[in-house]
């Protein structure tokens, strides 16, 4: 079953990538950012700390939305069991790899809560040469749209994909499909490991429901001010068909 996109308020469209090594650092960032961020993505580094679900619980108690970004990829039964358990937690988004239709169908069937499942299409750190090295000699946008349509057909609620592909995905899948875009660079490309990046306004105008921002906030001289500036961009770029 495809769940409709989350009814996000404008300030919830900014998701901060909480890429830190442990619970104390995570909560320090939440306190530092305060009201400027209402949605947090927690990923593999926190999982390795052994404090992952303590952080998830702490975020929920602070009335923050949570995006579990662990990119599950295993046999269908294993992924289904994981999603079934995770859907009992206060999680808004969760990622699964979008490479296997049977696994996606099992994950969708196992989702028993309000959590939205997002299929990983092509990582934003990858370009065409990277795909070619994997035996996929095609443009990233073509692979992304193909996987988005396959995920939608399998009952997955949306995708996580570069903002460069938000428009083609939205045109292919229609309005009732979630698109979350990482690799957002408010000030333009900065020469890091992200290859397929766009700005805030472009991602939202092209159909993104939410954007993920990490280093542009984390490395700023004033992270809360940087997040507030992005929130101002979001408010100025509200897309009518999503509100």
Swiss-Prot record:
One GO CC term on file: cytosol
CDD domains listed in its UniProt record: OMP_decarboxylase_like (cd04725)
Alphabetical UniProt keywords: Decarboxylase, Lyase, Pyrimidine biosynthesis
Reaction catalysed by this enzyme: orotidine 5'-phosphate + H(+) = UMP + CO2
Pathway participation: Pyrimidine metabolism; UMP biosynthesis via de novo pathway; UMP from orotate: step 2/2
Documented EC number(s): 4.1.1.23
Keyword Lyase tagged: yes
Active site: 71
GO molecular function: orotidine-5'-phosphate decarboxylase activity
Any GO BP annotation: 'de novo' UMP biosynthetic process
Record-linked InterPro entries: Aldolase_TIM, OMPdecase, OMPdecase_AS, OMPdecase_bac, OMPdeCOase_dom, RibuloseP-bd_barrel
Transmembrane segments: none
Binding site for substrate: 19, 41, 69-78, 124, 185, 194, 214-215
Quaternary structure (record): Homodimer.
Protein family according to the UniProt entry: Belongs to the OMP decarboxylase family. Type 1 subfamily.
Chain's role: Catalyzes the decarboxylation of orotidine 5'-monophosphate (OMP) to uridine 5'-monophosphate (UMP).
HAMAP family in alphabetical order: OMPdecase_type1_B
UniProt protein name: Orotidine 5'-phosphate decarboxylase
Species in which this protein is naturally found: Xanthomonas campestris pv. campestris (strain B100)
The encoding gene: pyrF
